Amino acid sequence: MSMHINNVITHLLYKNESEELQLGLRSEPIDSKSPNGEALVVALHRFYGDKPKGFAEFNYQSDFQEQLEKFRLKEINFYEFSSWTVTRLKDELSKYPFADTGVLALVEYSHLATEYLIIALLPIENSIRLDDGLDINITDHVEFSKITIAARINITDFETKANDKYITYIKGRVGRAVSDFFLDCLSACVTLNTKQQNTVLLQAVEDFCSDSKLERDEKESCKKRIFEYCRDQKKNGEDVQLQELSHELPRNNEGHTFFDYTQEQGYELQESFPVDTATVRKLTKYVGAGGGINISFDSILLGERIFYDVETDTLTLKGIPPNLRYQLQSRR
């Protein structure tokens, strides 16, 4: 992995006998060239890339931004910056009911010519280990799959003012509360709602195809191409580029591209935004669940093998999948 680690440090967040959050500061940063330090950063980078995220930017007169800029200008060192940051995190976290304990990690690193700063609370769990004598020992380990409090700053984009999406944060298990917590800590505000952007995209594609009076097969083909484009962008770790995506669709009856159409009709779409897989999947599938029923089928099947009666609110399926037929027949 083409990664260079500049600084890495961990501090401990724990509760005392009175269940009050306490902070144990490490005396110095971890050696960034050590195998353990490198393993931690690589694991954290990979974990973070797979999680759904929100986007934000610093507020005007952000305290955290001021400290970050002091560090980047070498007015304070990394240890001083990390100590100030985790103290602020502890104070803010104490206000919330999800005040977890664990290891607070700060990592400054570069990957593919981009500089990042990750701040994360790493949950610690017990596990059983057998030694050479087969004696049982209890050991602590970081449970990456349970990280819900983490944020990453794209320092390169922030310093070059490339966009307003340079802060990302994990959308955690208690939803908005975790988002509020990190935004408060970083003195930041939300700049982009990924799911909303993807939902607007789907509506724009639907309207564009309808206004272009495309035949049903043409319409389904267009939606499939858009889905495949979004899927490939997600797979490659890239955002949707609206002008690029526009090339996947034919011009409408007036000779305008899809991008032109979105501008003319006033769809509030950014020129680039991350892919929300669950949302764009609806381009080629109908998906729904509730009341013990979970249904998913390709949209092209509607009207061919699957029929919907609006008046009776009934779905009729012709040609049951063999594995489902076997289960139904075997349980009669």
UniProtKB/Swiss-Prot annotation:
A GO term for molecular function: double-stranded DNA binding
Protein name: Nucleoid-associated protein VVA0877
The keyword Zinc appears for this protein: no
Lineage: Bacteria, Pseudomonadati, Pseudomonadota, Gammaproteobacteria, Vibrionales
Keyword set, alphabetical order: Cytoplasm
Main location: cytoplasm
Subcellular location field: Cytoplasm, Nucleoid
NCBIfam families: PRK00378.1 (NF001557)
Family to which the UniProt record says this protein belongs: Belongs to the YejK family.
Any one annotated GO CC term: cytoplasm
Highest taxon in the source lineage: Bacteria
PANTHER family for the chain: NUCLEOID-ASSOCIATED PROTEIN YEJK (PTHR38772:SF1), PTHR38772
